[in-house]
Amino acid sequence: MWFKNCLVYRFNRDIDFNADQLEKQLEEFRFTPCGSQDKQKFGWVNAMGRHGDMMTHVSENRILICAKKEEKMLPASVIKDSLNAKVETLEAESGTPLKKKEKDSLKEDIIIDLLPRAFSRSNFTYALIMPKEGFIVVDASSYKKAEDVLALLRKTMGSLPVVPAIPEQAIETTLTEWVKSGDTPKGITMLDEAELKSIQEDGGIVRVKKQELEADEIKNHIEANKVVTKLLINWQDRIEFILAEDGSIKRLKFSDELKDENDDIPREDQAARFDADFSLLCGEFSVFLPNLFESLGGLTQPNA
């Protein structure tokens, strides 16, 4: 139970979370599979999957939830080919070209016909609610996916006063200062990967890997009006990650030392292992996230 990504939102006003009440609310929006004419379905599933029967999983008042989305796969090329063939046939029969409205109607008919036979794909997105710390952390690779989950949670609860957790100072400004000076806050270590982007609209992008970031070449890029927009960071020898200018935390990699703390639990006992790993994750995030935002200069103040 280890997150791979971290998109962090903060509460902009106090809100009480009751796990029992949330359990009932989530149940009302439980995921149901796509029917023959559904293009997609989105809802909540058991937090521990087949290893549990609760919609939530709780550790010291921190709540894990999981959303599932199922989408029917209808490639645009398949729809286009079917539409073109149908239009060709009808126009040949009538001797007159079809109007746009008629083509649009045909397209809808084709989609309705194809949906029952379409393959579907599913994906799961976890969210960690941390009331004490004031965060909701979504394990998503894009803000669009995270916002979809939060929109569903907002619909489920009736209200969800959260905003992206954004530092007072622009992240790219802070990252650039770190790389330029070689000086980072305690516990933060720059590694050997970064992205630098020109501040000019038509400027270039430089991506470096396995390269010393204190090298003159990197400093020259900064002197040439490039800013650091992504940086590979190690936090206290426990977590490695890429921090981007938009606040996204990706490629999370937890240290073997941390993950080995639960090695006394047999891997065959997946429910117990899930629970123990989740407790470790919560404990780590409760220190890591506040410390990271402090290192970045502190978060913007919520609206009064």
From Swiss-Prot:
Subcellular location(s) of the protein: Cytoplasm, Nucleoid
Origin: domain of life: Bacteria
UniProt-listed InterPro entries: RdgC
GO terms for biological process, alphabetical: DNA recombination; regulation of DNA recombination
GO molecular function: double-stranded DNA binding
Pfam families per UniProt: RdgC
Keyword terms, alphabetized: Cytoplasm, DNA recombination
Listed GO CC annotations: bacterial nucleoid; cytoplasm
Function noted in UniProt: May be involved in recombination.
Family stated for the protein in its record: Belongs to the RdgC family.
Name of the featured protein: Recombination-associated protein RdgC
Species whose genome carries this gene: Vibrio atlanticus (strain LGP32)
